Amino acid sequence: MAQSFTGKKRIRKSFGRIPEAVQMPNLIEVQRSSYEQFLQREVRPGVRKDEGIEAVFKSVFPIKDFNERAVLEYVSYEFEEPKYDVEECIQRDMTFAAPLKVKLRLIVFETEEETGARSVKDIKEQDVYMGDIPLMTDKGTFIVNGTERVIVSQMHRSPGVFFDHDKGKTHASGKLLFAARVIPYRGSWLDFEFDAKDVVYVRIDRRRKLPATTFLYALGMDGEEILTTFYDVVPFEKRTAAGAEGWATPYKPERWRGVKPEFALIDADSGEEVAAAGTKITARQAKKLADNGLKTLLLAPEALTGRYLARDAVNFETGEIYAEAGDELDVTSIEALAAQGFSTIDVLDIDHVTVGAYMRNTLRVDKNAVREDALFDIYRVMRPGEPPTVEAAEAMFKSLFFDAERYDLSAVGRVKMNMRLELDASDEMRVLRKEDVLAVLKLLVGLRDGRGEIDDIDNLGNRRVRSVGELLENQYRVGLLRMERAIKERMSSVDIDTVMPHDLINAKPAAASVREFFGSSQLSQFMDQTNPLSEITHKRRLSALGPGGLTRERAGFEVRDVHPTHYGRICPIETPEGPNIGLINSLATHARVNKYGFIESPYRRVADGKPLEEVVYMSAMEESKHVIAQSNIKVLNGEIVDDLVPGRINGEPTLLQKEQVDLMDVSPRQVVSVAAALIPFLENDDANRALMGSNMQRQAVPLVQSDAPLVGTGMEAVVARDSGAVVIAKRTGVVEQIDGTRIVVRATEETDAARSGVDIYRLSKFQRSNQSTCINQRPLVKVGDKISAGDIIADGPSTELGELALGRNALVAFMPWNGYNFEDSILISERIVRDDVFTSIHIEEFEVMARDTKLGPEEITRDIPNVGEEALRNLDEAGIVAIGAEVQPGDILVGKVTPKGESPMTPEEKLLRAIFGEKASDVRDTSLRLPPGVAGTIVDVRVFNRHGVDKDERALAIERAEIDRLGKDRDDEFAILNRNISGRLRELLIGNVALSGPKGLSRGQITAEGLAEVQPGLWWQIALEDEKAMGELESLRRLFDENRKRLDRRFEDKVDKLQRGDELPPGVMKMVKVFVAVKRKLQPGDKMAGRHGNKGVISRILPIEDMPFLADGTHVDVVLNPLGVPSRMNVGQIFETHLGWACAGLGKQITTLLEDWQAGGQKQALIDRLTEIYGPDEELPETEEELVELARNLGKGVPIATPVFDGARIGDIEDHLRMAGLDPSGQSILYDGQTGEQFKRPVTVGYIYMLKLHHLVDDKIHARSIGPYSLVTQQPLGGKAQFGGQRFGEMEVWALEAYGAAYTLQEMLTVKSDDVAGRTKVYESIVRGDDTFEAGIPESFNVLVKEMRSLGLNVELENS
């Protein structure tokens, strides 16, 4: 396989045996595709699909005024270019958004008074600005007010119809009460439910229940129609046969199966008895009777008793009703009907066994009998207290379920409904129909009769994903509907003939709804930017919480649990550990979301036991119809080897015959998410620990030096590429220039005139992430390197050579060491601190604003009252700290003074005033100082000035530096373009005939020497004889001019933005941001972890010479407790240790061979060793230079990939240990660093990938003497952020009580807490050097007294 630019610098050996049938999709595709469908920014207005913003506008427009004199129609929309690019938005705290322009058409009608005919009087079209819509960056994020945010996708219950029961909890008898619920995408919910008496009721929007037949009456049905819809009708005809009189009915075998008749069955045609009374008729007998020609049965009159009439018995001449449909027949009523001449009676086919009388009983309970009463009943339930009228009730009922404005099932809802109810309505049919309601009721009654299954709401076929686009579409619709009301009112109140569309529109509600969604929605989250993996996982997260979703309190176990349909769709491992467990999930690696919002997983087709190349994506509903084999089944020559293979049918694991199989998994890792797929030997870890491992990888802090893991899974490169942390080449080309901040590439693959032939990649240098970690990119290329499109040309945070590198490979020994690794503590070597192995840089941001106050403007200045020169040493003349200054807690970063109000003067001030005749300083010091716990280096300062405020010297210096940078970019790009065009011009001119030209060029054929005499800038003046060549020369000249103009225009545009004032909050004149880089070395109290959930806190840093060492004198870096493994069952870490040990051993061998070769030995020995390690199929570098680079990179260890569920076996590990010349047990003899003695038994030593987590002791340590107090209780605040105190709670009080330490206790509860007067006195006495104090009344007692008084209980304190 062809290797990438970084791939050939360090080849990762894979142990995977199963070939990937499908390439991994882009990991942030979920976000991107959803938002692209919403905006349709690249699609021309005429051909846009009816989705996203287009669908919203079409659903709200046209808007008519109240008397229909005018209509405002929607034509199309388009986005303008965003005002600032992503980088500028982050720097200026702005939102990266594009203005939305909508073309609207206002049509005004006039009506003729005589005829009432309408005609168009006027049509006006206009583009109207409808606010800004945030744009998504290439990384799938949004920049809102300068911070990167992610919109998390939401899982919610799919629209459609669901059947369920109460699990026997409602009624004491444990009877199952079935219910059906029709859930639309938007609109009222419709519930049908049984009660304990088997009567069917309906609820609309969970309000008071009504008999279900009321709803059917409202739909226009009558009692007889309802009964004949739900039940078959059986005719009984009065007849005499063989002297016996009875009622004849057609014989249907299925109706008599398993029945024990109370009376003899007689053949109505022959008069014979075909079945005796009291004997059970078997299925075989019933069929045999039909085969013998039995057509009609004659039953005794008693057989009709207890049956129900299917139709009204009416005398059509007199109109008299003898019996109504649904009436129960008894002997008397049967005789009465026979006496009235009814020779045929139609009854309902209800036998109370397979068909129950539920709808008939409901009809009996229902007191309504006509549609009008039913509508009134529904109206009273929905709008209690309003007197109903027929029109109002009719309109309300229609608007509830049958009006597309108010009710929308959505395409998904209709598809789901069609599937569940076996209907075939078009998915354009978004409202309910009578047929739907009847089908729901029939299925519900069928469930009660024991036919069919209820739905599983946790099945992923019944849950769907709402991604960014859909969430924003719903929000925007709400905003437009608010706007619609305002437009209608305005259309009625203005002179419609003179207004233009923009006069009618106030876009604020629409813009506000978008702003509110991005700013404060539960699903719009501050991006977790700790490292590239945490970014990617955040974008792939699925949350069941949020508006329209679940709440933590209400969610039970079932919703949170892993479901068989999660396989290949949602990761069963990665989920938070707290109250959100199971509610927040992660998308599996290969999963994607289809157009209906259902998660699909890929499968390979299998035909006749042969896996095909074809890959299909299936949702949970489609998958249930297939037989699926696992991906690790043996396949030889395109055919499955084993006759029985493991697989699953409908989610249940089983053994299958290979002929049964019609699908198979594409990859073993398709089950898990990205974070879980990064854990090697995941298959050997307990699931709980794997969960912690995948969660802790997201908390790994980017280190100063990153190492890709020796033992990886092959996912590292994919994650690094898709996360956006690395820089990827857009086009094939050659590296022209390079420095720490940018890479300039001359494109070689295309000569498209419209596109520049130069790509300039700007690198992020020491930028602050959302979590204050450091974003820094480093180039991987050299000048002259040839790169291809898609190659990684610069590493980012936590990446190395284009692979994810969250931590470092550390040499670990599993052994106890003097109790310093008790309870998961970690003992580390001083070498790790000395060599900055786990050192990280954190960038803190501080900002200060100079406001215009009532007493005058605040000022940012170096001139601060009562501050010595020492404190100002780092400030420049503008009062702002210099870049590169080392600062300590309490140092001034930005000097600022605030005007003081006129306060009454003290006698001393009056004296000074009298002597010097001037006002003492009238400003106070409000400078920005570095808070405690932060010390570091200033890496960046940004100054923002309000429009029209003069810039200080520092702001101008920053601006000049930025303009120089932009100018350099422009000049470099122009120079390369110029060189390109000059080269093409040179090729064109040489050999052609010149008619005229600049001075120094002779006429006739142009030669290279002749051309060299003339400056390249003058070549344009040459006139050629060949017209075609002259045309090419002109087009090159045009291209040259266009490029120059384009570059100049872009430069001027950027400079103009720089020089313009900044948009600051109201009342702010100037704002300064200071960025401090803090270097955090590893220290006791920091939290570290491996990738297998093996976490611990550093207990001690031991001098190198005291650490245990190997026979060759190498000291180990980390000592871990072996007791942390057995009970936790994360054995993966032991396998990783052994394999890491083998990798390092092989690396040492390669280094030795390389040194031998460079010292004059054989190159072939190195190549042979590499071939032995990688196998004969691996492509090794062709040039010596590349081979040396590869060997150097492998010196630290040969990196290997052990994919999840398809990784290295124990045999492979032993083979590699032997290959590296190590003991196949993976254990080594260790010596005690303190005594030099050998430990009693061999110890497991090897390399583990260790991470430093974002729980650093420096961020947690905190102390306070005095500080802020709570306003009401006057007790100290809590927490480091508020500079709070230590809580002295109930239990601590009990402890002091137990010791009888009365004075200490009194001190804790009064002067050290909320006795305001007492604590002031203590402060004074400490200043005096006195150590006595008096406790007063705590403020909390006063609060209690006030609360009692508010309850009307007067409490007064008496001095006794």
From Swiss-Prot:
Keywords: DNA-directed RNA polymerase, Nucleotidyltransferase, Transcription, Transferase. SUPFAM superfamilies: beta and beta-prime subunits of DNA dependent RNA-polymerase. The keyword Transferase applies. GO terms for molecular function: DNA binding; DNA-directed RNA polymerase activity; ribonucleoside binding. DNA-dependent RNA polymerase catalyzes the transcription of DNA into RNA using the four ribonucleoside triphosphates as substrates. Belongs to the RNA polymerase beta chain family. This is DNA-directed RNA polymerase subunit beta.
